[in-house]
């Protein structure tokens, strides 16, 4: 079962990306390094509720 998740920047808090994940394979929160346009650099983005 795939669900949509919102990814927020850990440095500025902006919610920049929407992605999907499989809850059965990844029950924990997703973390990805993505580009943050506010910080103008690649930062860690974490799944939000």
Swiss-Prot record:
<dbReference type="GO" id="GO:0003735">
    <property type="term" value="F:structural constituent of ribosome"/>
</dbReference>
<feature type="region of interest" description="Disordered">
    <location>
        <begin position="21"/>
        <end position="49"/>
    </location>
</feature>
<dbReference type="Pfam" id="PF00471">
    <property type="entry name" value="Ribosomal_L33"/>
</dbReference>
<protein>
    <recommendedName>
        <fullName>Large ribosomal subunit protein bL33A</fullName>
    </recommendedName>
</protein>
<dbReference type="InterPro" id="IPR011332">
    <property type="entry name" value="Ribosomal_zn-bd"/>
</dbReference>
<keyword id="KW-0687">Ribonucleoprotein</keyword>
<dbReference type="GO" id="GO:0005737">
    <property type="term" value="C:cytoplasm"/>
</dbReference>
<keyword id="KW-0689">Ribosomal protein</keyword>
<dbReference type="GO" id="GO:1990904">
    <property type="term" value="C:ribonucleoprotein complex"/>
</dbReference>
<comment type="similarity">
    <text>Belongs to the bacterial ribosomal protein bL33 family.</text>
</comment>
<feature type="compositionally biased region" description="Basic and acidic residues">
    <location>
        <begin position="25"/>
        <end position="49"/>
    </location>
</feature>
<dbReference type="GO" id="GO:0006412">
    <property type="term" value="P:translation"/>
</dbReference>
<dbReference type="InterPro" id="IPR038584">
    <property type="entry name" value="Ribosomal_bL33_sf"/>
</dbReference>
<dbReference type="InterPro" id="IPR018264">
    <property type="entry name" value="Ribosomal_bL33_CS"/>
</dbReference>
<dbReference type="InterPro" id="IPR001705">
    <property type="entry name" value="Ribosomal_bL33"/>
</dbReference>
<dbReference type="GO" id="GO:0005840">
    <property type="term" value="C:ribosome"/>
</dbReference>
């Amino acid at each position: 079962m795939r669900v949509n998740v919102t990814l927020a920047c850990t440095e500025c808090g902006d919610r920049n990306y929407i992605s999907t994940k499989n809850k059965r394979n990844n029950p924990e929160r997703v973390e990805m390094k993505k580009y943050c346009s506010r910080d103008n650099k690649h930062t860690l983005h974490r799944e939000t509720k």
